[in-house]
């Protein structure tokens, strides 16, 4: 890929709208824009300052394509670190295409996915983890995911890694110095201080690695499986949570024959609710497939909500307990919320009887929207948001997680070497490898394949 030519792309979502923004970046961005833009003030945009806005027209020869606002960002003062022009035009798809085609004829080429942010990284405007956070910020759809992406984009994660890397690099330099003076048997690196540093690095790495369990589900939404027998109100509960008729609601048992999935933000955390087919013995082939999928979805979920008809507890209480035991035995580590629906039909005596039989039960009425807030609070209780509240770094990226695991392994090798008086030259190998994995996270160590994989996930105009 050539990184020194001038690229163009639509920066706003494709399709018609009130306005669209077309972004140009490269050494010749301002010159190319000046060939198609006529300012109403008559000013030459090649002579204007950075961060200025100009009203004018995009023209193709004598043909006026649109009246636009043109923004100028020069060199290192731009997002990409090179001359950048942003053209705000009317949102007609025809106008967008005409302007982009005109710019292509004038010497631009179409940007590849994520190329504007890639150039920002290559020009030192941000490191690799910050660049990845840009994509996370764009795709964030809840407060927690937004907060994590913003912190990472502002350098919170990068600074932690950079600090660890710098301290380790200082000791690595002293170890290398010892190797240069090996014949004199001199220790430049204080072993006690080195051990303290390794313990500190190990502690931070373990904290970051542990945070991935929370960060990954926050980024992608916490999957919650709603399970139970047919016609106990699973679809009604899902619709109540989502405030819309998302699932099929019918008096006919077994009408939800497949899994239905939707998202809801509770307390700033995204939850993916999966309304599954009911669990029961059946000869219906279609429904049997749905029941099989139910157990697959339970396996994939973080939390299981088991729902039953509390008004039928007298009749089906024993069968209910058997079903609960089956889920508990098959998924012993899954957080389980037991909900008795249709509680508005119960007397006080019946309520007390059910609570005696199942102390952990939460009684609700999905139809009447009673107890739904209690359910939301229980769901939140399963998410460790302490790190969020304390503004600690939370890892959400699988690539970062993998590099952290590898770095931790190397640090533990160095610790073992220190404890067993391993020769400095052998310890130096593990230290260099740990430094490599730190650099892999921030982009100090990269290759074309890695960059290609990362930026291919971006939209074209970013």
Swiss-Prot record:
Single GO MF descriptor: GTP binding
A Pfam family this chain is assigned to: MMR_HSR1
E.C. designation(s): 3.6.-.-
Annotated positions binding (6S)-5-formyl-5,6,7,8-tetrahydrofolate: 23, 86, 125, 462
Keyword annotations from UniProtKB, A to Z: Cytoplasm, GTP-binding, Hydrolase, Magnesium, Metal-binding, Nucleotide-binding, Potassium, tRNA processing
Binding, GTP: 231-236, 250-256, 275-278
Top EC category: hydrolase
Annotated Gene Ontology cellular component terms: cytosol
Cofactors, names only: K(+)
Positions annotated to bind Mg(2+): 235, 256
Family: Belongs to the TRAFAC class TrmE-Era-EngA-EngB-Septin-like GTPase superfamily. TrmE GTPase family.
Role, per record: Exhibits a very high intrinsic GTPase hydrolysis rate. Involved in the addition of a carboxymethylaminomethyl (cmnm) group at the wobble position (U34) of certain tRNAs, forming tRNA-cmnm(5)s(2)U34.
Name listed for the protein in its UniProt record: tRNA modification GTPase MnmE
Organism the protein comes from: Flavobacterium psychrophilum (strain ATCC 49511 / DSM 21280 / CIP 103535 / JIP02/86)
Gene: mnmE
């Amino acid at each position: 890929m050539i990184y020194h030519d001038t690229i163009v792309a639509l920066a706003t979502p494709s399709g018609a709208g009130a306005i669209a923004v077309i972004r140009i970046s490269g050494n010749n961005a301002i010159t190319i824009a000046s060939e198609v833009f006529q300012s109403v003030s008559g000013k030459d945009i090649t002579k204007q300052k950075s961060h200025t806005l100009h009203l004018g027209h995009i023209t193709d020869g004598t043909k006026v394509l649109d009246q636009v606002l043109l923004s100028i960002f020069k060199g290192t003062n731009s997002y990409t670190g090179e001359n950048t022009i942003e053209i705000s035009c009317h949102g007609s798809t025809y106008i967008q295409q005409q302007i982009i085609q005109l710019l292509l004829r004038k010497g631009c080429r179409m940007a590849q996915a994520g190329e504007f942010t890639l150039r920002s990284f290559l020009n030192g405007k941000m490191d690799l983890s910050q660049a990845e956070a840009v994509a996370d910020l764009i795709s964030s759809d809840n407060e927690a995911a937004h907060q994590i992406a913003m912190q990472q984009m502002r350098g919170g994660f990068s600074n932690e890694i950079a600090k660890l890397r710098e301290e380790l690099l200082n000791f690595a330099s002293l170890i290398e110095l010892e190797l240069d003076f090996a014949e004199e048997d001199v220790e430049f690196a204080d072993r006690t201080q080195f051990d303290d540093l390794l313990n500190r690095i190990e502690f931070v790495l373990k904290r970051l690695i542990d945070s991935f369990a929370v960060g990954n589900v926050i980024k992608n939404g916490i999957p919650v499986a709603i399970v139970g027998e047919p016609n106990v109100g699973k679809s009604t509960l899902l619709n109540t949570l989502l405030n819309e008729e998302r699932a099929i609601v019918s008096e006919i048992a077994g009408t939800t024959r497949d899994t239905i999935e939707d998202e809801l933000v509770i307390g700033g955390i995204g939850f993916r609710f999966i309304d599954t087919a009911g669990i029961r013995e059946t000869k219906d082939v279609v429904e049997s497939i749905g029941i099989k999928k139910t157990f697959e979805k339970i396996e994939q979920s973080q939390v299981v909500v088991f729902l039953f008809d509390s008004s039928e507890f007298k009749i089906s209480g024993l069968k209910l307990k058997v079903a609960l035991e089956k889920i508990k035995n098959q998924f012993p580590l899954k957080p389980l919320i037991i909900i008795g629906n249709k509680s508005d039909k119960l007397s006080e005596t019946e309520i007390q009887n059910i609570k005696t039989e199942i102390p952990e039960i939460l009684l609700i009425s999905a139809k009447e929207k009673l107890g739904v807030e209690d359910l939301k609070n229980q769901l939140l209780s399963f998410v460790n948001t302490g790190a969020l509240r304390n503004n600690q770094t939370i890892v959400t990226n699988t690539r970062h997680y993998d590099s952290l695991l590898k770095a931790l392994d190397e640090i533990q090798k160095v610790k073992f070497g220190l404890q067993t008086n391993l020769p400095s030259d052998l310890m130096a190998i593990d230290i260099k490898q740990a430094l490599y994995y730190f650099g892999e996270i921030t982009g100090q160590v990269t290759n074309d394949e890695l960059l290609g994989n990362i930026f291919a996930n971006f939209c074209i105009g970013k």
